[in-house]
A protein has these predicted regions:
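Short hydrophobic beta-strand elements that form part
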Residues: 14-18, 41, 65
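Acceptor/aglycone-binding surface of glycosyltransferases and processive sugar-polymer synthases
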Residues: 68-85, 90, 102-179
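Acidic helix N-cap motif at the loop->helix transition within catalytic regions
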Residues: 24-28, 49-57
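Short beta-strand/loop segment that forms part of the nucleotide-sugar
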Residues: 30, 38-47, 64, 94
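A conserved acidic beta->alpha catalytic loop
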Residues: 44-53, 98
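Acidic donor-binding loop at a coil-to-helix junction in glycosyltransferase catalytic cores
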Residues: 180-185
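Short, conserved active-site loop motifs that form the nucleotide-linked donor/cofactor pocket
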Residues: 13, 61-62, 117
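N-proximal low-complexity "stem/linker" segments adjacent to membrane-targeting elements
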Residues: 1-32
Length: 192
């Protein structure tokens, strides 16, 4: 076990990976994540492709699964509940599509050591990345809506690469179950 893995475990940090039909990427994402953290929870959000089989073949992970797709927000809530029941204090979330780099997990550890109890949001490199106009608009609108709700500015409210202090989420009931739940979580954290 590496020193960083020991520090993650000592601080009670796990990684949660929600997935819906990511058969092309999930195996590699989970295996790369295991190189940086031994405590990985994968939430199978009603996958209908071979994702369940792929994650079932990976040792040393915890899988939460249910048959009907309920949305990313619901999957995150299930992952948070599982992490809390396992005694974790924090959860790093990353997407199963490969857009987040597991090698950045130590950066979350460092930020958590410097700012314990804070929600840490990883910033994606948005400049020079080819994205659809719809995706670009959605992110800009989400950033604007966050500002309206909180008076604070964030460059990328849509990134799923975050570290959550789980005690602050205990008992939280989200209004939404899909992708917008991530914005709801950031607004909630800003208010508290």
């Amino acid at each position: 076990m590496t020193n960083e893995k020991r520090l993650l475990r000592a601080r009670g940090i796990c990684v949660i990976i929600p997935t819906f039909n990511n058969e092309k990427t999930i195996g590699e994402v989970v295996k790369e994540t295991l190189c940086f953290c031994d405590d990985v929870i994968v939430v199978n959000d009603g996958c209908t492709d071979s994702t369940a089989q792929i994650i079932g073949e990976i040792d040393n992970i915890t899988v939460v699964a249910y048959s009907q797709n309920r949305g990313k927000g619901y999957a995150l809530q299930q992952g948070f509940r599982k992490a809390l029941s396992m005694g974790f204090a924090y959860a790093i979330t990353l997407d199963a599509d490969g857009q987040h780099k597991p090698e950045d997990i130590p950066l979350f550890l460092k930020a958590n050591q410097e700012h314990p109890g804070a929600l840490i949001i990883g910033a994606r490199p948005l400049q020079g990345v080819e994205r659809s106009k719809g995706s670009d608009f959605a992110n800009q609108f989400s950033n604007f809506w966050f500002f309206v709700q909180t008076g604070k500015r964030l460059e990328d409210t849509q990134t799923g690469y975050r570290l959550y202090p789980l005690h602050k989420l205990h008992g939280l009931s989200l209004l939404t179950n899909r992708y917008e739940a991530e914005l709801e979580l950031v607004v909630f954290a800003s208010w508290h």
